[in-house]
Amino acid sequence: MATIIEMPELVLEKVIAFLDFKAVLTLRQVCHDFRNFIDDLNDSKLPDSKFQEIKFVSDDRRISFGLEESKKRFTCISYSKGQRSFCGKTEFFGYSNILNVAVRDMEMILKFQKTILERLQFEFHNVQLYGGSLVHTVPIKLSNMLQKLNRNVKTRTLSIKTNDPSPIMQILRFVDPGALKTIELSSLDGKMEIEIDEFAKTEQWKKADGIHCGFNVLNLNLEDICHFSSCSITLNSITAQELDFLRKTPQKTSDFSFFCVVLSLLHGLKNDFWTVDRYGKC
């Protein structure tokens, strides 16, 4: 009798079609032949992991990501001090491999994800990674992985928290603009300022319904936010003419729901909240 690895590829494909995401990942770890076979399979022949939310975090202690299947089912994978912890099991490896292992696992998860995510969140803390490598290499590795994936990630909401503006474009450009509804950008220390004009040129920005920026926005053309039905931004200053322009904008948008402008003062202090409803009333 032939062993499972000696079965014809068509038979193996049918076997995998009956398995769930975790079972295929387990099968992938059995031997190199299984791993290579699964890695070479067309994405359409892999089971859907059906996650609702994926959260990737890198800080001074670990790299981790959370996988939410439902409100009652949540899995956390953590990589720290040369080890990986998943469902109570720990695997040890060299310090230099922490980032590589984490990004490779993230690639596998996204490869299996066919259902549109409700939320994809990245959190990049400005700290040193094990081995002396700066953490800004994390979004670069992720960007390279997303490019290798050869398809855009489908999510309703993209959330990026960082103290460095560079990861935003590195991630944003690989999100499917047809699925994306809301962009959430935040500063971890509350001190970051970002020139937003380059982001506004992307299809993701142009097709999204909502934008929420938790940092000072520079070089903003107000016409670039007129299409949003929901918007929250922080500006250093705003003119009376610009305020009047924003006040009239909701009347031109049928599905407008919320607009908020926060004016910032020196030393990072916040001042003067300005909001408007769909009828242009402040």
Show the residue positions of the predicted features.
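Non-core capping and flanking segments associated with repeat-based/extracellular domains
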Residues: 1-282
